[in-house]
């Protein structure tokens, strides 16, 4: 089975769907919104071609469920707020939004939400239906998605860690797995495996930057948010917990060791310095600002986390309930690729053990994601300077 067929979130609206388990991302979007407004402010001041008539934006790796339209809402609100601050008396521009993700993404679940979204946008923002046009653009952001110099603003949230393929070189010339008992480039992985993952990320991220520079107008903006490498004190990350859960099943005899050794997740968490250096080396973009922030990986569990998300009764608000919440989120993201390799029957057992391990981390007050926000501007051509 092709990687792109299984590298997607759980669709639909069931209990294991991404739509029902993406409150962490909702909280993260709230943290990013001030940076989004600043990025839009700089974009409108740059006075790009046609920007007062139609602003073309895209969400790269939009996934599915209500969070997809939260990103659109925040972008539209930021555009209208900044134009008001600038006392722009011209008629509001049309906003054309492209939602992009791999072909297997559940775009239909997003389309079902559009009628109510448009009505709410008209009621709360005064935007008449037709002044914000939303369409899907299926495809991989590791290749071209839009015509040359056609876009004003590009946004991506928690997608860049996914690689275009599992790195090559993870099996030796003798057919021996180089990344034994690991499922990604972890601290325990041997140096050749870590290098293979870094090389693949470097290739993919450099290609991503080059493709986006071709699609953006000169001085167009891009805002990226992603997980980045954290500190030792953050505790094991969720990929470590997933790896531990699968290893537990191997020890119990529920899974064969060879099944684990042949499984490698196409994901790489870069360091801040790695991302910064790659942007500078590719050369198409200027870094306007770069900032990190931490979130617990059980963030979004309750409304006490500064976000309007589903709440839980106090008697269940302990580390076990929080761990189950984290397990549901990770399952909604990785179940398709796990099921394609290990089979669907073992999935509940994997995430039961995941939750058990996560509870131990949460009890110790650990378990953090380090998040990176980076705002980029496409460098002007010499003829534009």
From Swiss-Prot:
The record marks 155, 267, 344 as: Involved in substrate discrimination. S-adenosyl-L-homocysteine binds at residues 18, 62, 67, 101-102, 140-141. It comes from the Eukaryota. Binds 1 Mg(2+) ion per subunit. Caffeine binds at residues 158, 161-162, 238, 369. It is an enzyme of class 2 (transferase). Keywords: Magnesium, Metal-binding, Methyltransferase, Transferase. Pathway: Alkaloid biosynthesis. This is Probable caffeine synthase MTL1. It comes from Coffea canephora (Robusta coffee).
């Amino acid at each position: 089975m092709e990687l792109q067929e299984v590298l997607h979130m759980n669709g639909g609206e069931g209990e294991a769907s991404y739509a029902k388990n993406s409150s962490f991302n909702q909280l993260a979007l709230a943290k990013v919104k001030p940076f989004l407004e600043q990025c839009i402010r700089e974009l409108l001041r740059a006075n790009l071609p046609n920007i007062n008539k139609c602003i073309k934006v895209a969400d790269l790796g939009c996934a599915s469920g209500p969070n997809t339209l939260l990103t659109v809402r925040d972008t539209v609100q930021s555009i209208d707020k900044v134009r008001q601050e600038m006392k722009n008396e011209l008629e509001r521009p049309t906003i054309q939004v492209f939602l992009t993700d791999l072909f297997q993404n559940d775009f239909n679940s997003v389309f079902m939400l559009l009628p109510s979204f448009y009505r709410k946008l008209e009621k709360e923002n005064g935007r008449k239906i037709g002044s914000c046009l939303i369409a899907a653009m299926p495809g991989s952001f590791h290749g071209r998605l839009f015509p040359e110099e056609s876009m004003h603003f590009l946004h991506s949230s928690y997608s860049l860690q996914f690689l275009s393929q599992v790195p090559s070189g993870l099996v030796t010339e003798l057919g021996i797995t180089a990344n034994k008992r690991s499922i990604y480039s972890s601290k325990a992985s041997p140096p050749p495996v870590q290098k293979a993952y870094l090389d693949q990320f470097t290739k993919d991220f450099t290609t991503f930057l080059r493709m986006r520079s071709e699609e953006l107008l000169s001085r167009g903006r891009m805002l990226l948010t992603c997980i980045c490498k954290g500190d030792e004190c953050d505790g094991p990350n969720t990929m470590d917990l997933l790896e531990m859960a699968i290893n537990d099943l191997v020890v119990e005899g529920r899974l064969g060791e060879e099944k684990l050794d042949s499984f490698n997740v196409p994901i790489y968490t870069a360091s801040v310095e790695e991302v910064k250096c790659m942007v500078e080396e590719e050369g198409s973009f200027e870094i306007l600002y770069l900032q990190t922030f931490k979130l617990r990986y059980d963030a979004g569990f309750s409304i006490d986390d500064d976000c309007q998300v589903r709440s839980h009764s106090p008697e269940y608000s302990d580390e076990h309930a929080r761990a189950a919440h984290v397990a549901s989120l990770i399952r909604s993201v990785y179940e398709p690729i796990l099921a394609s390799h290990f089979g669907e029957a073992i999935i509940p057992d994997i995430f039961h053990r995941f939750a058990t391990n996560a509870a131990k981390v949460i009890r110790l007050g650990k378990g953090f994601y380090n998040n990176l926000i980076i705002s980029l501007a496409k460098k002007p051509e010499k003829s534009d300077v």
